[in-house]
Amino acid sequence: MQEVTFFFDDSGVFHKNERSGYFVYAGYVFTNRSTLDAAKRKYINANKALKKALGRNDELKAAGLSAKHKRSLFNAVKEYDSVSVTVNLSHIYDHILSKKHSICRYKDYALKRCIKGKMKALIESGVISKTEDITLSIFVDEQLTATNGYYNLRDSIIEELQFGISNFDYGIRHQNLFDSNVYVKLLYCDSKTNYMIQASDILANRIWASYITKNRNLRSIDNHIALTLP
């Protein structure tokens, strides 16, 4: 059984008054356990060293760190595969931005597109096979949970990858990626206990900050696949 593991966090507010004008999902992707464990060790070591230097024992969130300290955490795991999807909020219809359910649907759609883009790249590069069964484990910060959103998002990812159905692009049918069974585990986690979600918070904030500071170099990341919507 093939396995791919994703970790995600977000940055920005999905609202027309968001000061950067953008909403970002970003995170890390692993195709084997040994690489994931190595990344986790590196991030934990960098995290502990920074906590010691700062005299802190709470969770280190990007919003409460200086650019220098965020950079040190980012550098600890920058060699690993990562992904992001950035939503240009100025191009999102008001009727979507004005309804909580519509916002949740669009955010799920964005996350699904991001995952599909990476899976397509993994197939094209020969890292995974489209004809073998596969399990996706997707770890997301629990604060991103939408009411009744778990099964909608999980089932939607399976449909998109295995059957080629898109529920948001009305009237458009996307080709399926896999000619095999796709299993999805969607897990909402407390970021306090998940270091790769903490690393994803740093990454998402870096991409979001690139729009605030108008510094495109912050988005120049090796081994990274970036998607922009709509």
Label each residue range with its predicted role.
Residues 1-230:
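Phosphate-ester processing/binding pockets and catalytic centers
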